[in-house]
Amino acid sequence: MSARNILVINCGSSSIKFALVNEAQATFPLQGLAECIGSPEAVIHFESAAGKESVKVPNADHQAALAQILPRVEDAAGGHLDGIGHRVVHGGEKFFASTLLNDETLAGIEANIQLAPLHNPANLSGIHAAINLFPELPQVGVFDTAFHQTMPEHAYRYAVPDVLYKDHGVRRYGFHGTSHRYVSKRAAELAGVPVDNSSWLVAHLGNGCSTCAVVNGESRDTSMGLTPLEGLVMGTRSGDVDPSLHNFLHKTLGWDLAKIDNMLNKESGLKGLSGLSNDMRTLAEARQAGHPGAVLAFEVFCYRLAKSLAAMSCALPQLDGLVFTGGIGENSSAVRERTLEHLKLFGFKLDAEANARCTRGVAGEIQAQGSPRVMVVPTNEERQIALDTLALLDA
């Protein structure tokens, strides 16, 4: 049987990230990004071995953009596409694994819109567009939240009145589940440790950041909660703040909920602390030049990350390793070094040369001799979504 091809789609409100995944190839035959969807500036960027190309598609909606993308995908797949895997942000309590998409499962995704009002409608737009364009192809939903459905109740419940959970689903769900699942399994493979007898601390650090405790291939706790705002300091998100901050800002400054929500999600984090940028690469340069805001943002980011990792360790029976992934986790040797300096009780020590070497997609162990294992493992959510899609096709 020839190697199969899966198209992976990640739809945002005004964007579509896509990748063609061939099960036998390490690199993607075609990938790209459609951005500014619905506006006169809408454009699709394609990238393949042949090079890069951008195509303007003024005012295209999700379906019109996908109609431009899919013929190129089919061509790159040699005319044979086997299925489509969709990233879906929120599966609530209904979806604890990836699932084939049909009328029933689509209704379940729609029922969770109140839990992800920005993301799930965008995900559904992409799903409906793909189904309209390729009604005969099997399509699969892969949920950011599904991996964390194995968390015990004492880890996912908030200490608020029970009725809020039972009637309104107010609980911790966690996100980045596809990345945490892929990376923890890959770490076990690289370390030669059985997945079903392993315990990992995973730090997914990008513009969004979260930690996760993974035991025997299952999530036992994670730093994000009801929404992706809970937990670590992120690019533009505050992470944990005093819940009374909303009341304080309303009474003191007269801010309404929408303004506070926008500030915490889009104006805070590294951007808010530094007054400069949400990009750790920009802050790294500014920090070297002595920019006070960049120095502060870096220090708060690393300390809060270390604090979260220490908290996640409560869910582990043992520690087989700490794993860094995501754009910052994979590329910032300085963040890794500073974070571990805050975790002295764990006995972590880095091999400076190995730490410096593991950037730009290089995986490996970076601990010094005698230290607990520390690894850098590049994430690959697109491949994990494709693997889930193939598994359901084989079921």
From Swiss-Prot:
What Enzyme Commission number does this protein have? 2.7.2.1
Matching entries from Pfam families are given as: Acetate_kinase
The note on cofactor binding and number reads: Mg(2+). Can also accept Mn(2+).
Kindly give the CDD domains that the UniProt entry links to this protein.
ASKHA_NBD_AcK_PK (cd24010)
Q: Which UniProt keywords apply?
A: ATP-binding, Cytoplasm, Kinase, Magnesium, Metal-binding, Nucleotide-binding, Transferase
Gene3D superfamilies attached here? 3.30.420.40
Where found, per UniProt? Cytoplasm
- Which pathway does it take part in? Metabolic intermediate biosynthesis; acetyl-CoA biosynthesis; acetyl-CoA from acetate: step 1/2
**Major subcellular location class:** cytoplasm
Please give the function described in this protein's UniProt entry: Catalyzes the formation of acetyl phosphate from acetate and ATP. Can also catalyze the reverse reaction.
What this protein is called in its record is: Acetate kinase
